[in-house]
């Protein structure tokens, strides 16, 4: 459940309004893009249709990264390659407490959608906060560089536990591993035991996909 201030904050994200408060890279770029673009809707998962818009946003992010020194040029000395999924390469920090995810937002229609997803994740799942530290460009492909606490599970995650946890934030189970907060119009997809880990009966949502 959310208090009035939190609810208004979430409504501003959904409605495409500028969000106030402490600014980080994700919020700064998201607010900038919202001046010219709207988030795509969950029913509009049409990558080819949004390809031009996504490229425009990529160019804007590149310009902002140059002017604000957001390019990440070297991380190899502090991280070791760990794994690779559909959209991200994952590296483990040398100290073993954090992971670095290099994400090209391939599953999102636009970069604005990707940034909204990061911001929503950080509201709902504080213990696995995404810290967007900058961007990385290789072979003409833009990647977001995101740091997150490293979590090791000691128990299998049960879907019923996920349902209970999410229902406390007004997310209702819709089908398979998808949930929806109908009051706010926020969708949360692909929530299963590989993306949600359990340690000492605490759930850690390590990989989420929010959409509006």
Question: Which residues are covered by each model-predicted region?
Answer:
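Juxta-kinase regulatory segment immediately upstream of eukaryotic protein kinase catalytic domains
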Residues: 1-77
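Short Pro/Gly-enriched beta-strand edge/turn motifs at strand-loop
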Residues: 69-76, 171-179
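Conserved hydrophobic "DFG−1" position in protein kinase catalytic cores
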Residues: 92-93, 150, 198
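Conserved structural core of kinase catalytic domains
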Residues: 104, 122-177
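Catalytic activation segment of kinase domains across protein kinase-like and atypical kinase folds
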Residues: 180-212
């Amino acid at each position: 459940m959310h208090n009035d201030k939190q609810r208004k904050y979430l409504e501003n994200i959904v409605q495409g309004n500028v969000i106030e408060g402490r600014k980080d890279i994700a919020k700064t770029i998201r607010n900038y893009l919202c001046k010219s673009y709207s988030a795509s809707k969950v029913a509009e998962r049409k990558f080819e249709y949004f390809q031009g818009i996504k490229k425009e946003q990529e160019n804007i992010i590149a310009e902002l990264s140059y002017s604000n020194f957001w390019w990440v040029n070297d991380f190899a000395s502090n991280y070791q390659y760990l794994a690779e999924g559909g959209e991200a390469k994952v590296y483990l920090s040398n100290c073993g407490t954090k992971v670095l995810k290099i994400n090209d937002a391939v599953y999102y229609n636009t970069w604005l959608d990707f940034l909204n997803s990061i911001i929503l994740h950080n509201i709902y799942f504080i213990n696995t906060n995404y810290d967007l530290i900058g961007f990385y460009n290789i072979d003409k492909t833009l990647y977001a560089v995101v740091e997150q606490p490293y979590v090791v599970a000691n128990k299998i995650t049960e879907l019923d536990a996920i349902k209970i946890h999410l229902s406390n934030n007004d997310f209702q189970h819709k089908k398979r591993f998808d949930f929806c907060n109908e009051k706010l119009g926020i969708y949360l997809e692909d929530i299963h035991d590989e993306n949600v880990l359990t340690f000492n009966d605490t759930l850690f949502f390590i990989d989420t996909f929010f959409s509006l």
